C-alpha cells in the first residue's frame, strides 16, 4: 500500500467520525468534553501505525492530517473560532503532525531498547579512538540506501531519529 492511499483512507475515516463531535455539540456538551471526543474518537484514527508510514508522507498529506483537527476545532468553537493556532492553544492541543513526529521518536527509542526489536539497528563501528575532544556522536550505523524511497523508509528514518538525539 502506498502512503498516499493509506493517508487518504485514514483522513476519510476521521472525517466520517466527525459527526460525533457535531452531534455532541448540538446536545450541549462542554468544550472540554468536545475536545476529548475529538481526540479520542476522531484524531485517534490518524495514529494507526504512524511510526511506519509517517516518515514517507508528503507535505500535502501532512496538511490533510492537520486539516482534520482544524475542522474539528472549528466545529467545537463555532463563531468563537479565531484561527487554528489560537484554537489549538485554547484546547491545549498540539498539531496532529507534531504529535505523530513525537510518537515516532518515542517508538524509535523504545524499539532500540527492546530485546525483540533492537536487531533493527546496527551498532556504530568504532572508526576512531574516543578522546576528550572527539566522541563518536552516532549510536547506530546509518542504513545505506541506493534509492531515495528506501532512504525514507521506516528503519533508516528511525535510525536517523535515534542518532540525532
Predicted segments with their positions:
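Non-catalytic, peripheral interaction segments enriched in hydrophobic/basic residues
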Residues: 1-112
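Charged boundary/loop elements
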Residues: 47-62, 66, 75-78, 82, ...
Amino acid at each position: 500500500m502506498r502512503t498516499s492511499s493509506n493517508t487518504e483512507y485514514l483522513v476519510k475515516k476521521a472525517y466520517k467520525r466527525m459527526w460525533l463531535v457535531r452531534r455532541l455539540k448540538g446536545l450541549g456538551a462542554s468544550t472540554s468534553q468536545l475536545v476529548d471526543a475529538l481526540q479520542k474518537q476522531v484524531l485517534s484514527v490518524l495514529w494507526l501505525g504512524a511510526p511506519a508510514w509517517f516518515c514517507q508522507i508528503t507535505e500535502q498529506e501532512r496538511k490533510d492530517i492537520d486539516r482534520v483537527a482544524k475542522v474539528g476545532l472549528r466545529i467545537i468553537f463555532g463563531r468563537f473560532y479565531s484561527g487554528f493556532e489560537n484554537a489549538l492553544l485554547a484546547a491545549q492541543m498540539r498539531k496532529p503532525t507534531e504529535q505523530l513526529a513525537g510518537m515516532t521518536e518515542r517508538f524509535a527509542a523504545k524499539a532500540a531498547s527492546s530485546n525483540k526489536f533492537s536487531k533493527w539497528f546496527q551498532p556504530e563501528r568504532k572508526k576512531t579512538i574516543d578522546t576528550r575532544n572527539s566522541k563518536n556522536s552516532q549510536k547506530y550505523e546509518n542504513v545505506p540506501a541506493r534509492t531515495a524511497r528506501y532512504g525514507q523508509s521506516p528503519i533508516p528514518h528511525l535510525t536517523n531519529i535515534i542518532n540525532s538525539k
